[in-house]
């Protein structure tokens, strides 16, 4: 069953765009950069105005992993509050306002999970800035500011989308060409080959296509050493973007968005004891 989504609302959601940008930048700061690049960061993320084609496969209750993740976060917040009871920061207020004692979230009748097939060939784009370092005739001889735009991203995957405790969870499960999909009954089996995995599937690629355009000063466009480094950086970015999706967003990892507002109270839909 196919259905439409309000893509315009999603693409204009500042919280969503900020979360994705922060997640990407957090990943970039955790990796070792090659010697020819410095200060690599995501400057802008745009969802684009062309939505993916989404086909609903199954509707089920959320998997237990999502509840465990929320409860672990709440437990950590409670411990931080105990250690710093005089601290009136956001984390402490959030725990108090939710009226949590045992820091446990239980399944609610309003919780829902969708298994969807998602095919995307839109105009999403990611703008990246960096400094191209020239190490000749000496180390770090010159640093050139450059801007790279990642676009024409295409993928066709099976995804898990869950709504619970005012949070949205999103995870890539596998490519639609994966032979594991021939065993439909085992897709959402928590003891099956997909959800029981403790690491990302080595065979999942997610991204089927993408392109990168690079802006560099006109005075360097004919410089062979600069162009060679630009080519290496573009290939490096492609590999790291694919690694990011596999390690940070593909099961058993996910990206989640918290829609909890401080003014919410114990009338929340979910049962929190």
Curated annotation (Swiss-Prot):
Coiled-coil intervals: none
Organism: Vanderwaltozyma polyspora (strain ATCC 22028 / DSM 70294 / BCRC 21397 / CBS 2163 / NBRC 10782 / NRRL Y-8283 / UCD 57-17) (Kluyveromyces polysporus)
Family recorded in the similarity comment: Belongs to the MDM12 family.
Functional description taken from the UniProt entry: Component of the ERMES/MDM complex, which serves as a molecular tether to connect the endoplasmic reticulum (ER) and mitochondria. Components of this complex are involved in the control of mitochondrial shape and protein biogenesis, and function in nonvesicular lipid trafficking between the ER and mitochondria. MDM12 is required for the interaction of the ER-resident membrane protein MMM1 and the outer mitochondrial membrane-resident beta-barrel protein MDM10.
GO terms (BP aspect): aminophospholipid transport; mitochondrial genome maintenance; mitochondrial outer membrane translocase complex assembly; mitochondrion inheritance; mitochondrion-endoplasmic reticulum membrane tethering; peroxisome organization; protein insertion into mitochondrial outer membrane
SMP-LTD domain residues: 1-260
Topology of this chain in the membrane: Peripheral membrane protein
Acidic residues composition-biased segments: 78-90
Molecular function per GO: lipid binding; lipid transfer activity
GO terms for cellular component: endoplasmic reticulum membrane; ERMES complex
PANTHER family to which the protein is assigned, alphabetical: MITOCHONDRIAL DISTRIBUTION AND MORPHOLOGY PROTEIN 12 (PTHR28204:SF1)
Organism ancestry: Eukaryota, Fungi, Dikarya, Ascomycota, Saccharomycotina
Compartment(s) where it occurs, according to its Swiss-Prot or TrEMBL record: Mitochondrion outer membrane; Endoplasmic reticulum membrane
Main location: mitochondrion
Protein's name according to its UniProt entry: Mitochondrial distribution and morphology protein 12
UniProt subunit comment: Component of the ER-mitochondria encounter structure (ERMES) or MDM complex, composed of MMM1, MDM10, MDM12 and MDM34. A MMM1 homodimer associates with one molecule of MDM12 on each side in a pairwise head-to-tail manner, and the SMP-LTD domains of MMM1 and MDM12 generate a continuous hydrophobic tunnel for phospholipid trafficking.
Notes on the domains: The SMP-LTD domain is a barrel-like domain that can bind various types of glycerophospholipids in its interior and mediate their transfer between two adjacent bilayers.
Gene: MDM12
UniProt KW keywords: Endoplasmic reticulum, Lipid transport, Lipid-binding, Membrane, Mitochondrion, Mitochondrion outer membrane, Transport
Region: Disordered, residue numbers: 76-98
